[in-house]
Amino acid sequence: ARFAEAILKTCFHYGPIACKEPDNYEARANLMWASSWAINGLISGGSANNWSVHPMEHELSAYYDVTHGVGLAILTPHWMRYVLNDETLDNFVDYGVNVWGLDPSLDKYEIANKAIDLTQDFFCKDLNMPASLTDIGIDDENFEVMAKHAANVKGGSIQGFVNLKPEDIVKIYQAAL
């Protein structure tokens, strides 16, 4: 978990620099380093991956002209809000405290919600990414079929912190409008 947190902190630090200074070698090099570690499988340590947003976003990219990163930036905060509950709370508290540096003495739900808000602000404000599916011209026309496809990739539901059935996925898409 700490390795993943370090990768996120690296991205949160260097992402805005790379956007403001596209020729900044240090920022680009650190983002490439972080990306290599994020994708090579080492941080999962052979265990199941809880990143439920990827199959949901793959459907966005299959149906619409949207890059994977933009789709992830839009969906991730909505997925986080949807799966936040008493069972997942400590994961979000760890994320808020260890990645965003939030005060661990705050109420746990306050930490979790603030971490989600900071994540959305990072994507939308710091990286100037679209904030919603509406911002990129997507409506709810294909949500039902996209949700079924996303869930079928994993045998009928997306496994993760919270298992997501097609109806859950539709709700996340709708929240992202």
Name every feature range the model reports, one short phrase each.
Residues A1-L118:
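Active-site segments that bind and position negatively charged phosphate/pyrophosphate groups
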Residues V99-L177:
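C-terminal charged capping/lid subdomain of soluble metabolic enzymes
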